[in-house]
């Protein structure tokens, strides 16, 4: 629910009538002013942290205050908002994603862009709509739950590639991505009026 989402920028919580660094594009995300001004103020009990900012924004103390089994998407590159080992040291139940390939759950646009475009090209689509994006998301989710092929398993050595906290998203070089995502988009495009 939108009222459960709090957006922060380099100046803190984006709240209504905030003056410093309040661009018009941020105003749509402004929450009522309840006196909470920092990420540390609003992270208490949070289920999800989605960071696309810079290194060391999320501290271990903040992670401790999050809800049970929090999802932490620390996506800044090359150094995320918090490194997975630091988060796991204080919250073993955390599900952590980064943009880095040297940690589990790498979130990278390489998982979808090539295959979304392939699907669009296959049907002559001139635009990528929300339904096509959702079809890609559902195809990726299906793959994350599917049993791994020998090709994928051999490419990633002894890593456990069964769905769980350290594997919620397919690996970028999973050859099944193209055969799942592109056709899923094609079906959506064809079924639309």
Where are the model-predicted features located?
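Short acidic, glycine/serine/threonine-rich loops at helix termini
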Residues: 1, 16-21, 61-63, 83-88, ...
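Short glycine/threonine-rich loop-to-helix capping motif typified by GTGT followed
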Residues: 1, 63-64, 163, 175
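Glycine-rich phosphate/diphosphate-binding loop of Rossmann-like nucleotide-binding domains
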Residues: 1-46, 50
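Structural motif
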Residues: 4-6, 47-50, 70-73, 93-96, ...
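A general structural motif
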Residues: 30-34, 53-54, 100-104
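Long hydrophobic segments that form regular secondary structure
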Residues: 35-36, 40-92, 124
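Adenosine-phosphate binding glycine-rich loop
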Residues: 76-182
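Residue-level detector of conserved catalytic or cofactor/ligand-binding positions
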Residues: 186-193
């Amino acid at each position: 629910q939108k009222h459960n989402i709090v957006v922060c920028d380099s100046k803190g919580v984006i709240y209504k009538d905030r003056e410093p660094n309040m661009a018009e594009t941020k105003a749509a995300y402004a929450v009522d002013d309840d006196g909470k001004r920092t990420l540390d103020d609003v992270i208490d009990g949070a289920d999800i942290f989605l960071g696309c900012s810079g290194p060391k924004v999320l501290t271990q103390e903040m992670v401790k205050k999050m809800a049970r089994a929090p999802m932490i998407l620390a996506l800044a590159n090359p150094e995320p908002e918090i490194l997975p080992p630091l988060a796991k040291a204080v919250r073993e139940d955390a599900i952590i994603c980064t943009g880095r390939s040297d940690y589990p759950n790498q979130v990278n646009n390489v998982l979808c862009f090539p295959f979304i475009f392939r699907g669009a090209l296959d049907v002559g689509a001139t635009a990528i709509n929300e339904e096509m994006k959702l079809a890609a998301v559902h195809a990726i989710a299906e793959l994350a739950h599917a049993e791994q092929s020998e090709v994928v398993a051999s490419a990633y050595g002894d890593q456990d590639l069964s769905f769980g906290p350290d594997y919620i998203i397919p690996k970028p070089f999973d050859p099944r991505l193209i055969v799942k995502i592109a056709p899923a988009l094609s079906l959506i495009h064809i079924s639309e009026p």
